[in-house]
Amino acid sequence: MSHADQLARTHLAPDPADLSRLVAGTHHDPHGILGAHEYGDHTVIRAFRPHATEVAALVGGDRFAMQHIESGLFAVALPFTNLIDYRLQITYPDSEPYVVADAYRFLPTLGEVDLHLFGEGRHERLWEVLGAHPRSFTTADGVVTGVSFAVWAPNAKGISLIGEFNGWTGTEAPMRVLGSSGVWELFWPDFPIGGLYKFKVHGADGVVTERADPMAFATEVPPHTASRVTLSSYTWGDADWMTQRAARNPVFEPMSTYEVHLGSWRPGLSYRQLARELTDYVVEHGFTHVELLPVAEHPFAGSWGYQVTSYYAPTSRFGTPDEFRALVDALHQAGIGVIVDWVPAHFPKDAWALGRFDGTPLYEHSDPKRGEQLDWGTYVFDFGRREVRNFLVANALYWLQEFHIDGLRVDAVASMLYLDYSRPEGGWTPNIYGGRENLEAVQFLQEMNATAHKSAPGIVTIAEESTSWPGVTRPTNLGGLGFSMKWNMGWMHDTLDYISRDPIYRSYHHHEMTFSMLYAFSENYVLPLSHDEVVHGKGTLWGRMPGNNHVKAAGLRSLLAYQWAHPGKQLLFMGQEFGQRAEWSEERGLDWWQLDEQGFSNGILRLVRDINDIYRSHPALWSQDTVPDGYSWIDANDSANNVLSFLRYGKDGSVMACVFNFAGAEHSGYRLGLPSAGRWREVLNTDATVYNGSGIGNMGGVDATEDPWHGRPASAVLVLPPTSALWLEPK
């Protein structure tokens, strides 16, 4: 019998077309060729090990040498059927033989229900089925440990697993596609936790690329781009916080947020070190929350995290995912909430990441007029595709559930809502009704918000939305987008425009400080003095203030007091709490040295600590942020004196009078209408000497008499220091 006849009779060699696709890396079902297969009265085991010199099958106590067929395919015919278990003994050049379970004898690690839910865009725990998952199986010959890999790439011609385990060659670990789901899967025995990997994708366009796992839970430290297998062993200590969170509604709670870029707050700190130092700092200065610029992995540090390539992996720059958990845990145990910036609007075009993942527009929209963001040179997600929407919604839940994140600040919402956002005429495609609204993005945001609030009660979602889109914070069941809050960009622009003017010109722009109250209760607002205001040549808050250093410091103190008194939650970017004078750069740390001087920075920082303490302890400043009952003008029209005054009311009946003198001169004998006679205590005076102010004030309080003024039944005569804020409460 010829050799060819023997191969044909024993089925050692597969169909030539199958073998050709296997060798080329484009076979959709390598498990149909490799592994153990019965043919009549015998069983054929095939293994594809192109770099091996020898392969044998170990069955019970017997060793069966496998024959090299061609191109790295080894096979052996066993003279029996009903094979229960076996191992492969593999020898590579210049190495000892090693024994391993055969990857191609295991059933799929994804079930039909998982695939169905994903296909429908409804798998809320997608991270539990896609990506890399350490697993163990009990077999007749013992326990087999390894890692299962699953990736969605419906148009790929073939996908292979590559990594350190196979020298990054894309041949010996081909994956199988599961039915019509587009999901490719493989369980690889003995793959180590901590091991690096990528997917070698044969794209529909004929291009072969090496891709990071879209669902990677850990990565190499940039600029390296491989994904890393990880398994959490973290034990949380924030049970009390999580229980309390579920019972709260952040809209009706104090929220004073410190916005942080982890890499430049104090450069060189790890997640573990930040857990100590950042937590201590935030607690000491009275903030209730931190908001972290995006922590999902991103290759380009200069993007500040806003060009994400691994949506499910905390950046490895500062440590492991469990060490990031430790940072969140430490903040929670100290009573600090954690918000992260989340970027579902767009993603970068890096050839190893999400873009054209399977050789077609997969995560991005196929229409370039919808699928590319020209300003940023990025791709835009296809929000109408069920699997893409599932990828993003599940990602939001992943951060909330796996990392106990308390809120998501969604970046660039306006770019998602409008099809013509920053596009020239003729450069965009209208919706089915001929309009400019991105209906698919609206549906995605509604789904994300509704699902997030259902799955994680007490969390907050915040929109960075710069237009007048109606109902951003209206519940989804009432037709809104369903966010908890949105950034008040109008307040920010008007306030900074006003405060940057010389006081002698401010009276002509008084309306800039009153206009925000015309819409203050139309949405649930956050008042942001964010990172966007201290970059790209904008300088700093300190630098915007007119005058000499004394006047600048007074201006910044009054601005911060105005922000905290205005209806809405507060957000302040790092460095502005002590009046950093240099524009922020991600390439260097904050100018902490300013606090070592006997200058104005210490006073500004002391003020922030005090206003946070006052704010948290006075419900008048936060419990009715979103309703007109929480606010009343005393005098909105004193433009001649550059004075604004209003009352804040708490649900508990408390009241706070807030007076702001934005003139460069003192106003003595200033009569202010008040709701009741009696002693009014000066809770805050931003010109106090403890803040390095001039010390002008009212000796700690004033006596209001029953003399009507400003439409109020009582009034008091005040001294208003130049460029200052006073907060008063009835004693």
From Swiss-Prot:
GO-annotated molecular function: 1,4-alpha-glucan branching enzyme activity; cation binding; hydrolase activity, hydrolyzing O-glycosyl compounds
Key words of the record: Carbohydrate metabolism, Glycogen biosynthesis, Glycogen metabolism, Glycosyltransferase, Transferase
HAMAP family in the record: GlgB (MF_00685)
Protein name per its UniProtKB record: 1,4-alpha-glucan branching enzyme GlgB
EC number(s) reported in the record: 2.4.1.18
Annotated GO CC locations: cytosol
Organism whose genome encodes this protein: Mycolicibacterium paratuberculosis (strain ATCC BAA-968 / K-10)
Residues annotated as the enzyme's active site: 411 (nucleophile), 464 (proton donor)
